[in-house]
């Protein structure tokens, strides 16, 4: 494996959950060598280029970061760049990722957390993942894997950042969760550092989430059960962050010590924070039926899905993502949609 020398980059261009856990959306556009990161004042971008012997499909890999088209923390610009604002342990960061070529990604970062983010970038993009034990036998899964060799899991290592939107997405329509996320981040988040696209925000820190008044959650259409779960998680955020260094089983146990975080929510968090390729969103409103229709031609329930996907362990979530990216995932529509509930009017 090789790495490009770092340097100054050009200026940036001006029910459990409903659908988010499945990864059905279609996105189109081995380890990485430890490349030194350039250091510079906060106002100047720090840069890094990472490469891998295997392809890297940047768009597909980072797509789980985005919580809807209007996500205040994420932006995709016409030049193909992916902008995101996060809160690293060392401080806020704005980063811009761009597909360099089939096996390379360019990164720019601004803010106090820049150096830490760039140091962790290969880890985030799972450039160290080993797929030697992933040999799917089902022809659709095998074909989906062949078509999408660049899909990586996502491993941000930022647990609380994944907790809040996952809790907001519990047992509601996706549009309801995304609207609540936008309202709360716009109100309590902070401006992203550096030359970020207009409106890019850093999500509030745990202490801020902990002290958001209940009536504000209510006006954002978040009922007491979900808001209480967020507050409880915020109180032990440092302990939750430690889960990133635990085994998948122990990490799930740590997450589920929070009342209101169950198997579905823990999986949604693991898919983004831990890069867990086996984090199946059991309990998702659509997932089991979609897996059944896609692979068996008939609907199945959660228990049958778990049994059927067992041979794919520890890559069950990877298989689900691949089916979505390849356009194979489908489920016939029967009957009316689940009714929309506006809790803010109750």
Mark where each language-model region is.
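Extreme N-terminal basic, low-complexity initiation segments
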Residues: 1-16
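HhH-family (HhH-GPD) DNA N-glycosylase catalytic core used in base-excision repair
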Residues: 2-3, 24-346
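Residue-identity detector for glycine
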Residues: 7, 17, 21-23, 31
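Residue-level detector of intrinsically disordered terminal segments
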Residues: 14-21, 36-38
């Amino acid at each position: 494996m090789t790495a490009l020398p770092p340097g100054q980059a050009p200026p940036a261009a001006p029910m459990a959950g409903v659908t988010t856990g499945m990864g059905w959306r279609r996105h189109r556009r081995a380890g990485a060598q430890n490349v030194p990161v350039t250091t510079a004042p906060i106002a100047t971008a720090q840069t890094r280029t990472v490469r891998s012997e295997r392809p890297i499909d940047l768009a597909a890999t980072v797509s789980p970061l985005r919580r809807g088209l209007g996500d205040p923390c994420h932006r995709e610009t016409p030049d193909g760049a992916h902008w995101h604002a996060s809160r690293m342990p060392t401080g806020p960061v704005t980063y811009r990722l761009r597909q360099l070529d089939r096996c390379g990604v360019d990164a720019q970062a601004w803010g106090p957390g820049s150096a830490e983010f760039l140091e962790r970038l290969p880890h985030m993009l799972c450039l160290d993942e080993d797929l030697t034990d992933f040999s799917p036998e089902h022809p659709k899964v095998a074909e989906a894997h062949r078509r999408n060799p660049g899909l990586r899991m996502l491993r941000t290592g930022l647990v609380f950042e994944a907790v809040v939107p996952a809790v907001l997405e519990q047992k509601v329509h996706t549009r309801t969760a995304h609207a609540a996320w936008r309202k709360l981040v716009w109100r309590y988040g902070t401006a992203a550092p550096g030359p970020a696209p207009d409106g890019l925000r850093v999500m509030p820190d745990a202490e801020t989430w902990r002290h958001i008044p209940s009536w504000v959650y209510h006006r954002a259409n978040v009922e007491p059960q979900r808001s209480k779960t967020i507050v409880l998680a915020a109180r032990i955020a440092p302990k939750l962050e430690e889960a990133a260094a635990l085994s998948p089983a122990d990490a799930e146990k740590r997450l589920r010590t929070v009342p209101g975080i169950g198997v579905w929510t823990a999986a949604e968090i693991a898919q983004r924070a831990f890069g867990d390729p086996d984090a199946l969103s059991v309990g998702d409103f659509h997932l089991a039926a979609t897996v059944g229709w896609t692979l068996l031609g008939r609907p199945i329930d959660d228990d049958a899905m778990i049994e059927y996907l067992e041979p794919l362990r520890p890559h069950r979530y990877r298989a689900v993502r691949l089916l979505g990216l390849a356009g194979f995932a489908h489920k016939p529509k029967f009957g009316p949609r689940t009714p929309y509930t506006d809790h803010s009017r109750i």
